[in-house]
């Protein structure tokens, strides 16, 4: 009975000539349709060997159609965020506002001035659109947007400290979501990691010692603690103190703000987060932060700061 059922199965060519198959080829392409039909035949053979009945050609094509539909269906679905985490990076990060969605739809439905200067009648700069707004929002001289904040830090370290030292407190060598670790990003950039202080206590004098050793140091890096806090017997220099130290040694300070608040979050009853303007006002030469968390935009890493520092990164 098993062998008879196997012999009764239609060939792939016959399945291709079934009435419903041309629509599958038109929708999914011939290679994908062929693959799905062959998978249907494999399923049928296994079913027959297990004692089941042999399906007819129409049933095999219907199974292939269902397989193609499921395989190519979107895996993104709307969900309700009941986690208690307001901005959940695994659930799409910050939802886009209605105004932002409308602006995207308005531009994305056709051609745009993404990289064209209408007044000059020639190619323009695609980064200019975001840069102008970011400079207005933060007070920075120049700005640049990349894929994510890890990418922003990687670009900054590569452009400013490749082959040279970058000084950072041991308490800031954190790992953020997605497995991004500050030491790994620094290693990939080609910068040499110079750790100072301890996990819970780092002083200005620790930075001073590292800078006085005669090592080739390019910058001082301050990294956001991400989503954890060390409490108790702790201390670390303020950004202003690091800027004073950097100025004395002729070194820029790069401040990785993580989520990157543009507004004072305390006014909404939340813990105060350092704002981008505060970092720049304190004297940071360059500030990196995310565009898809507190800023409320799509996934992005944003770099703002002095023009002399940002421009070479472009």
State each model region's role:
Residues 1-69:
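Long amphipathic alpha-helical segments
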Residues 13-17, 35, 42, 62, ...:
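Solvent-exposed alpha-helical segments within well-ordered globular domains of core cellular machineries
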Residues 42-45, 85, 264, 294:
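Glycine-rich phosphate/diphosphate-binding loops and the adjacent beta-loop-alpha structural elements
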């Amino acid at each position: 009975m098993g062998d008879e059922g196997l012999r009764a199965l239609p060939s792939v060519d016959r399945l291709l000539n079934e009435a419903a198959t041309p629509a599958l080829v038109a929708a999914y392409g011939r290679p994908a349709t062929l693959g799905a039909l062959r998978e249907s035949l494999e399923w049928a053979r296994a079913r027959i060997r297990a004692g089941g009945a042999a399906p007819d050609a129409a049933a095999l094509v219907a199974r292939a159609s269902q397989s193609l539909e499921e395989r190519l269906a979107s895996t993104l679905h709307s969900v309700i965020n009941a986690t208690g985490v307001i901005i959940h990076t695994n659930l799409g990060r910050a939802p886009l506002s209605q105004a932002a969605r409308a602006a995207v739809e308005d531009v994305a439905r056709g051609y745009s001035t993404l990289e064209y200067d209408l007044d000059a009648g020639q190619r323009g700069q695609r980064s200019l659109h975001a840069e102008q707004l970011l400079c207005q929002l933060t007070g920075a001289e120049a700005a640049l947007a990349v894929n994510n904040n890890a990418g922003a830090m990687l670009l900054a370290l590569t452009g400013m400290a490749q082959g040279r030292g970058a000084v950072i407190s041991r308490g800031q060598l954190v790992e953020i979501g997605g497995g991004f670790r500050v030491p790994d990003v620094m290693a990939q950039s080609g910068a040499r990691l110079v750790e100072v202080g301890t996990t819970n206590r780092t002083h200005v004098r620790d930075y001073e010692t590292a800078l006085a050793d005669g090592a080739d140091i390019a910058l001082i890096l301050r990294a956001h603690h991400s989503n954890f806090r060390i409490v108790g017997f702790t201390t670390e220099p303020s950004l202003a103190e690091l800027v004073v130290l950097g100025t004395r040694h002729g070194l820029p300070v790069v401040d990785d703000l993580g989520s990157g608040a543009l507004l004072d979050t305390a006014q909404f009853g939340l813990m105060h987060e350092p704002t981008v303007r505060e970092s720049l006002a304190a004297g940071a030469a360059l500030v990196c932060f995310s565009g898809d968390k507190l800023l409320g935009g799509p996934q992005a890493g944003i770099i703002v700061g002095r023009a002399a520092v940002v421009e070479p990164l472009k």
